[in-house]
A protein has these predicted regions:
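Substrate-binding clefts and substrate-entry loops adjacent to catalytic sites
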Residues: 78, 100-108, 128
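Soluble non-cytosolic domains of exported or imported proteins
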Residues: 13-17, 82-91, 108-116
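Active-site recognition of the HExxH zinc-binding catalytic motif
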Residues: 90-103
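Auxiliary, metal-adjacent structural segments of Zn-dependent hydrolase domains
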Residues: 12-76, 81-82, 128-131, 136-138
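Non-transmembrane alpha-helical segments in soluble domains
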Residues: 23, 27, 93, 119-126
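Post-HExxH zinc-binding segment in Zn-dependent metallohydrolases
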Residues: 111-146
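Short, Lys/Arg-enriched N-terminal segments with co-localized hydrophobic residues
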Residues: 2-14
Length: 151
């Protein structure tokens, strides 16, 4: 339990406001139903975040930006996440999209299909809200947003 004198209290209020603003933006810029409670967000050091996401599985050396834990309905961000950086805000939006997909019980043939709308919406958000161009590799996006072997 946090109290108004606790320094974490103010940060929790700021996060609630940021998440609410991102969900309002998402509702206005997509066909997703965002009429739901806001997600819980947890911050972890990079190594702990990767351990929680990958477990003992081998993974690339590319840093994990964040993830949405579907089992616990929690967005996990690195403890280096900064609310003043447009990219970091867009990463949070990306994970909020996964939360909204999950809460709306949207069915996918595979987990990769969850990425189909996230990258374009993240790009639109960066351009529209922060005037930041993000020209991601569309072939890479296609590869990671479709089921392996066509399933």
């Amino acid at each position: 339990m946090y109290f108004q004198g606790d320094p974490h209290f103010k940060y929790l209020l700021i996060m609630k406001e940021i998440i609410t603003a991102l969900m309002i933006w998402l509702g206005a810029n997509s066909d997703f139903n965002v009429n739901m409670d806001i997600p819980t967000v947890m911050f972890l050091p990079q190594d702990k975040m990767e351990q929680q996401y990958y477990g003992d599985k081998k993974h690339s050396d590319i840093n994990l930006h964040a993830f949405y834990d579907t089992e616990h309905d929690i967005i996990v961000l690195p403890d280096t996440w900064d609310r003043r950086k447009p990219w970091d805000l867009s990463v949070l939006l990306h994970e909020i999209i996964h939360y909204v997909q999950d809460q709306n019980h949207i069915q996918f043939n595979c987990v990769q299909e969850m990425e189909a709308k996230t990258w374009p919406l993240q790009q639109k958000y960066l351009q529209q809200v922060h005037d930041v161009g993000w020209d991601y590799d569309r072939l890479w996006h296609f590869m990671i947003s479709h089921c392996p072997n066509g399933y």
